[in-house]
Amino acid sequence: MSKRIYNFNPGPAALPLSVLEEIQATFLDFAGTGMSITEVSHRSKPFDAIINDAVTRVKRLLGIGDDFKVLFVQGGASMQFAMVPMNLLPDGKSADYVNTGTWSTKAIKETKILGKTVNVAASSEDRNFAYIPKELSLDPNAAYVHITSNNTIKGTQWADFPDTKGVPIVSDMSSDILSRPLDMSKFGLIYAGAQKNIGPAGVCMVIVKNDLLEKANTGLPSMLAYKTYADSNSLYNTPPCFTIYAIDLVLKWLEETIGGLEKMDAVNREKAALLYDLFDASSFYNGTADADSRSLMNVTFRLPSEDLEKRFVEEATKNDLGGLKGHRSVGGCRASIYNAMSMEGIQALVDFMKEFERTNG
């Protein structure tokens, strides 16, 4: 096998090596068909088994039953910024949105473009999105409360979800889906672009409660209506079969290799602690998120100067530590440590950071 680096890119991101190896082994002959998964019909029995297995595994991991539908939708999380209000926000009602960064800002913008009424229930923009708000001004009559569970750019994450007094939470979980157990009774809909934590790019997983589906707005274009996907098992048109196959393998890895979401959460906390403990003991590395809002998925930090940050990224890359440059909108550095990032990768990064501080501090 050719050399592989430790991939800290924010998305598309690292996949479990065992998943990549299984894809490699089956790529030319999928399930004894004599065809690649990229050639198999989405109407075939072999692919039907894949998509059904993926749905079953998601439900098992999250502990949900037939009161939820699991959908595979194209267009990424960005399309969900519009699909959510199109389907779930009736005329004459408003929705609560909590603004914690770039992606929730975009979700608010798309909702307003549709002429829908938005109540910004809280925002952390006053301090450049460095924290998760604790005080929310929620409307008890809102159609839903929209939350971005993890903020990849600023490195913040909801540690606990708010009590919305029965109003369903709609959450963009693109960057922390299936990284920890969830109390699914709080959620009406979860959406997650695949390319950060559950697979390659090309599909957005939507987990939606049946009661929201049943009262969803009608008169929408077919491809923008959740009901279309729910009624067709996400096979209304040709889905990205390869991506869904890879997602199914990642779900299998989560269940059978990791042992479920509680164990995944424990591993993720241990990984993040190695980096945050380093920050807390150093005056050279400074985390950008408030301590009580730190993300377990995206660890953002600054060095004493931009020149040092540039050198840090360059030298890290030479040491097979890739993808550590911060988002172009904020600069700095960022280590994305999703489920698939190994403890060995984190330790290699910590060792490099200590040596870089020793020689440049």
Curated annotation (Swiss-Prot):
EC top class, as a word: transferase
Known EC number: 2.6.1.52
SUPFAM superfamilies: PLP-dependent transferases (SSF53383)
A matching Pfam family: Aminotran_5
UniProt keywords, alphabetically: Amino-acid biosynthesis, Aminotransferase, Cytoplasm, Pyridoxal phosphate, Pyridoxine biosynthesis, Serine biosynthesis, Transferase
Reaction catalysed by this enzyme: O-phospho-L-serine + 2-oxoglutarate = 3-phosphooxypyruvate + L-glutamate; 4-(phosphooxy)-L-threonine + 2-oxoglutarate = (R)-3-hydroxy-2-oxo-4-phosphooxybutanoate + L-glutamate
Record text on subunit structure and interactions: Homodimer.
The protein, known as: Phosphoserine aminotransferase
